[in-house]
């Protein structure tokens, strides 16, 4: 027996989710946003600039204390090299918290270091993707992320905040 889904059928199964992008580089945030838009991965995209702000968002602290300002993400795109608290530290805290650990975290970074790959998977990352250099390649990556994480897999509904 062969299982096939048409693109239309898959698109009808896509559920809108909040995508939270944690990246300190404004240009990378805008390129990723443009690539998501170009790839037609239409969702609610939110930005944070470092690991501390990411955790503030997830725990609804500080400027994110209003639940409308920080809806629960269905997916986190995480850069590793950020100021204040880097992506590795933030990932460790997210995956150690029973209220947050189910949120899929995709590491999206310029690193190709094998040490980073092993370490982030050991910390609980769901995927490790090296940021493509060319915009069209980034669009292709965003299409595949959207296809897999939004159209194909079943994600838990928003993780409860503390």
Locate predicted features.
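Non-catalytic signal-transmission and effector/linker regions of two-component phosphorelay proteins
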Residues: 1-20, 26-46, 50-55, 59, ...
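Receiver (REC) domain active-site loop signature in two-component systems and cognate sites
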Residues: 80-82
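Hydrophobic residue at a beta-alpha junction
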Residues: 84-85, 94
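Short, conserved "switch-loop" micro-motifs in signal-transduction and mechanochemical regulators
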Residues: 110-112
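Short, glycine/charged-rich "phosphate-handling" switch motifs in NTP-dependent
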Residues: 126
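A Lys-centered signature of the CheY-like receiver
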Residues: 131
